[in-house]
Amino acid sequence: MAVISMKQLLEAGVHFGHQTRRWNPKMAKYIFTERNGIHVIDLQQTVKLADQAYDFVRDAAANDAVILFVGTKKQASEAIKEEAERAGQYYINHRWLGGTLTNWDTIQKRIARLKEIKQMEVDGIFDVLPKKEVALLNKQRARLEKFLGGIEDMPRIPDIIYIVDPHKEQIAVKEAKKLGIPVVAMVDTNADPDDIDVIIPANDDAIRAVKLITSKLADAVIEGRQGEDSVEAVEAELAAGETQADSIEEIVEVVEGANEN
C-alpha cells in the first residue's frame, strides 16, 4: 500500500507546479502535462518516490539518525516545526544562517549563549539585574530562539536533511552536499533536482501539500524509532481513504476541473 494515496495528493494540490515560464528543464521527467500555463506534476511518480523517501527516512531513523527538517518560507514554517517536534527531531523554520552545518562550532557557541540566558532566568539572576539589561537579554534570547531554537538540543550535525523548497534553501543544500549529508526534498517544477538525493516531486507552495508530505516523513521517523505498531493508525487512515484515481487520464480530468474553478 502506498504511503500517500493519489486521492490525498490531489486533495492537497500536490500536482500543481509553477507557471511554465518559471520551470527548470531538469524537472521535465517529473512533469505530466501543462494546463492553462501551469505545469502539472506526474503524481504517479510522486506516489512512488514518496514511498522511497518514507523508506529511506524510516530506515535511517531505525538506526538512530539525527534528522533536520528545514523550511523557512511562510507556507512551510508551521508544518516544519510541528512535524519535527512530533517526530522528536530538529528544525529550522525561519532564516537559514550561513554556516549552520559547515561552521557548526560557531553555531554551537550561539546555542550555548541561548542556554546560558535561559539558565540566568531560572536561577533568578533576572530578578537582580536592571530592567534595561533584562530587556536586552530577553531580546537576545528571542532572536536566538527564532533562528536556533529548533536545533538547540541537536546533538550533532544531522545525518539527513529534509527540505521544503530546495530552490529557496540553496545554501542549506550546498552545505549538506559539501559535508556529504543526504538531502530529502519536496521539489517543485522550478527547482534543480541534481543535488537532491531523494526527490519528492511536489507543489511546495501550498500549505496543505507541505503539511501532507512533511507529516508522512515525520510518520516515517516515528515508525523507524518505535516500530510498525506506532503507525497502525496511519495505515488505517490510508485504507479508509484508498479510493483514488487509477489512471493518469483521471488525474488530468481532476486537474482540468480544478483549473476551471
Curated annotation (Swiss-Prot):
One of its GO terms (cellular component) is cytosolic small ribosomal subunit. This is Small ribosomal subunit protein uS2. It comes from Streptococcus mutans serotype c (strain ATCC 700610 / UA159). InterPro entries: Ribosomal_uS2 (IPR001865), Ribosomal_uS2_bac/mit/plastid (IPR005706), Ribosomal_uS2_CS (IPR018130), Ribosomal_uS2_flav_dom_sf (IPR023591). CDD domains: RPS2. One of its GO terms (biological process) is translation. One of its GO terms (molecular function) is structural constituent of ribosome. Keywords: Ribonucleoprotein, Ribosomal protein. Signal peptide: none annotated. Belongs to the universal ribosomal protein uS2 family. It holds the Pfam family Ribosomal_S2. The gene is rpsB.
